[in-house]
């Protein structure tokens, strides 16, 4: 639909919690890290690095996440885990799970990684509204400033940036729950800064109870 990821682009991927945006973007990051040998920087403000790595291992090896969490893997899953670990170890994926990170820190770390590793192929931020502001502005002003800075970072480093975003609870009050631009939480100028705004939506999310595993729920990442 988008003809792939392009340099300089800021892509906003928005969804309600539990729909699967983290799993979706991790799949993109894994494919780029493995298939193109490009460097991928992931700034995870919601989940720790260990949890993200476990999600990627489960996806890579078709392993039940509950089995991995409890250490009760089936024999075939142990073999798959070994293969998945070998595959992911070759991917140039760098995860930063610093809590309360500010945009200036993200920019500095990306510049350093690009310089030390001869470029970056993708930057992922999970998620936009958790980046700390630098002043006393209200949250809409903070998020607007952050989206502008993410776009500037994409242009400066000539790299696609995918920033995940939460949707406001207002979408739950409508009969038609398909998200629209105004549903992006503290959106401000996001739609002006982003080259692409994409939404993840599943009908079954509203038919079934969301999973209890946090952002994406379920037994598989």
Describe these PLM feature segments.
Residues 1-8:
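Phosphate-binding P-loop
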Residues 11, 94, 123-125:
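Hydrophobic positions in the central parallel beta-sheet of the AAA+
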Residues 25-27, 31-119, 133:
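Cytosolic-facing regulatory segments adjacent to core modules
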Residues 41, 45, 112, 120-163:
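Helical hairpin unit composed of two closely spaced alpha helices linked by a short loop
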Residues 141-221:
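Phosphate-binding/switch region of NTP-binding enzymes
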